[in-house]
Amino acid sequence: MKPTAETLCLGVESTADDFGVGIATSSGEILANASSSYIPEEGGIHPREAARHHAEAADKVLNVAFTKAKVNPRDVTLIAFAQGPGLGPCLRTGATVARALASYLDIPLVGVNHSVAHIEIGKLTTGALDPVTLYVSGGNTIVSAFDSGRYRVFGETLDMALGNCLDVFAREAGLKHRQGVPLGAALERLAADGKKLIPLPYVVKGMDISLSGLLTAATSLLQKRDIGLEDLCYSLQEHAFSMVTEVTERALAHTDKKEVLLTGGVAANKRLQAMLDVIAEEHNARFNAVPLQFATDNGAMIAWTGVLAYTHGVTTPVPKSFVKLRWRLEKVDVPWIK
């Protein structure tokens, strides 16, 4: 099937703890962005429990999206889904929903790379055209820029993602994930009241960073009665954010690009935004941060990236729509950028 004059794409996101459905047009209008989050009673994400949540939430989230967009399923001309990377059980649940919709409606299916989608929704919503991108979330920490048909990775974490580092520390500190207030936001609020910078490991190796030692050191200090939690949260943030800002600045200097884009769940952090804004200004570049509603995992970013891919000749036959748990950013062709 060839693209219609106005492609209407429904996107399904299910890589981790969020099940999201977005609806986007080929003109770049986001008509709906609905989601439901799995919140574990304790600890981090349990993949099979999260997948069960997604399966149970799918019908409701789909209905909310159709209602918000004021369209019915037969109006949709394309189905996109997050094909990877992510947690296997969660990815498979979303892929099953997407395959069922595409088959029932007899319309094309497009598998989307989750990391590419975070970049593309950031570009759409901020107007950035050719940025150095810092993508930071619970599962990814990547500095990238476009070159020769693909997004090229300039630097990344050697161990754990920035969002995971912050979340694990927050749980160890006794903070709770509540609906509407994720752990990272709770930690950010405490950090805003911190005044004392406590020395912690700072590990940058070339263009890559390591966060596990920082987390271990900060967690061990939770038992110290003479160190306030606010100061510890502040110090953890300052060290971690300085690391990713340093490697982002190096990529900016190397590429000589004139835009910086911050995207992913951690992009909501105002302190990180401020640090990146400083280095962008020093290099005569414009800083852009993805809007809050599109920072965390969402279906709209999958829908929009699906539109971009489909209108440039990309489709995914159902027999080849298997999920890709470790689908790296630089392995994805990006034909919509010339």
Question: Which stretches of residues belong to each language-model region?
Answer:
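N-terminal beta-alpha supersecondary unit
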Residues: 4-77, 81-85, 114
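Short glycine-rich phosphate-binding loop at a beta-alpha junction
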Residues: 73-83, 256-267, 288
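Short Gly/Thr/Asp-enriched flexible loops that form oxyanion-binding sites at enzyme active sites
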Residues: 81-105, 270-279
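A short helix-loop
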Residues: 2-7, 14-15, 22, 31-32, ...
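A contiguous, well-structured pocket-lining segment that forms one wall/lid of small-molecule binding clefts
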Residues: 72, 185-260, 269-283, 310-313, ...
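Conserved phosphate-binding catalytic cores of ATP/NTP-utilizing and phosphoryl-transfer enzymes
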Residues: 1-6, 107, 111-132, 305
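Conserved phosphate-binding/catalytic loops in two-lobed NTP-binding clefts
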Residues: 111-112, 277-301
